């Protein structure tokens, strides 16, 4: 959200959602091989994860970036024989399928590993779909940044939360969205609930008044969204 008044804290991990429909006939294995052939990636601590070191050019130590591979839980990817990477397996998640509904194209300009200027175009999850993924995430793990990401999107989306809520309303028959709504209602039921308190934990403010304001703000942002979803 480059137009946001408050910048996002950023991220040092990349989630790649694998579309099984398009990755047939060995294309899934070919995708992994492209990364491995660069000799820049190695297996991470998780079975569905590669890691690579990125020099930000700021004079500091390189940052380790985690690249995680996800797929919808109800699809099957063609396995490569023999395996390209021992012990590697894609993480299947119920909400992953949502990201293929209406992805947005993002142009990314930078330098290749050989130093050439280049622009590539990526399909990324829309904000509405990103929120679905994050809602499911807070329903299954304790990672404060998930709740931060949800509230950041609700508070900073350029055209407001109404279009996001309208998108979710249009998916009322989709069980993945129904579950996402239920999770948000549970996790943001009050300022003292799991979601708002995760936001407080993420910001790590020292004084009680600031922490209370952060919790209240997170709660109200989620409640506004849920009231519009209906």
What spans do the regions from the language model cover?
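Compositionally biased terminal segments of proteins
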Residues: 1-230
């Amino acid at each position: 959200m480059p137009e946001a008044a408050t910048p996002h804290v950023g991220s040092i991990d990349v989630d790649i959602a694998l579309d099984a429909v398009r990755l047939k006939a060995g294309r899934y294995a070919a995708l992994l091989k492209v990364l491995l052939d660069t000799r820049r990636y190695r297996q991470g601590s998780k079975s569905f994860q590669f890691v690579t070191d990125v020099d930000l050019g700021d004079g500091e130590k390189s940052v380790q970036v985690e690249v995680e591979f996800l797929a919808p839980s109800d699809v099957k990817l063609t396995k490569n024989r023999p395996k390209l990477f021992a012990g590697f397996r894609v993480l299947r998640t119920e909400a992953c399928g949502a990201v293929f509904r209406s992805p947005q194209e993002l142009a990314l300009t930078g330098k290749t590993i050989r130093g050439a200027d280049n622009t590539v175009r990526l399909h990324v999850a829309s904000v509405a779909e990103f929120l679905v993924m994050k809602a499911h995430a807070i329903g299954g793990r304790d990672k404060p940044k998930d709740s931060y990401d949800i509230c950041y999107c609700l508070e900073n989306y350029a055209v407001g939360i109404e279009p996001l809520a309208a998108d979710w309303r249009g998916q009322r028959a989709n069980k993945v969205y129904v579950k996402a709504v239920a999770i948000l209602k549970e996790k943001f039921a009050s300022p003292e609930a799991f979601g708002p308190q995760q936001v407080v934990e993420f910001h790590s403010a020292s004084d009680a008044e600031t922490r209370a304001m952060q919790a209240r703000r997170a709660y109200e942002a989620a409640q506004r969204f849920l009231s519009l979803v209906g």
